[in-house]
Amino acid sequence: MNAGEPVPFCIADQNGYSTIKLRDAADPQHETLLTDSLVTVNIDDVSPPINIAGLLRIYGKTYRVLPEATTSLTELRRGPSIFIGAFDNSWTLRLTTPLRFHFANNPDMTQFWIEDRAQLGKQEWMLDRGVQQRTGTYKNYAIVARFIDPNTDQFAVIVAGIARGGTGAAGEFLVDANRLNEIANHVPKDWNRKNIEIVLETQIIEGRSGPPRIAAVHVW
């Protein structure tokens, strides 16, 4: 990422009401409850920006966080951007829709998957929300991608999993040099000068993600 602007992380934000516990400065054991409107971020979407920001700092890059709900196309046209999260981030869905690997779901939004345009109708990388909620143990899938987005003429980086644990695993993959070296077994030698999209899979056990594995790669 060579642009001079701070690199934006576009991350999903959720508005809602919550109860906040406030403690007395003179007596921290004394507390009161306050109901307030909050903007919250999914905890699974937090670790990737933290890890990637560490890499950016090594290369002397600055960054900023943009809430998905208020991010505009004008802002994204200023330079490369990083998009965190899938079904809670409309920009991720919008930018990945034309790609070979993209996110999809059934009308009831109970099943979510990554679809391959080369094999339409095949739902190999699918997650059933019912299974996820009942057991906490399931296979999860994610997309990691880097490409020139035609809407902005800038590089877009996607770090997005279907459900809890997926986005975190994608972020782990992106900052792990050993895992990035695995890409060389799946791509041509000049892949670093091309657009690339990777499908990852990870085993979730009791809500915790295992190591990410490469399921498919597309370079163009």
Which residues make up each language-model segment?
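Solvent-exposed alpha-helical segments and adjacent loops
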Residues: 1-220
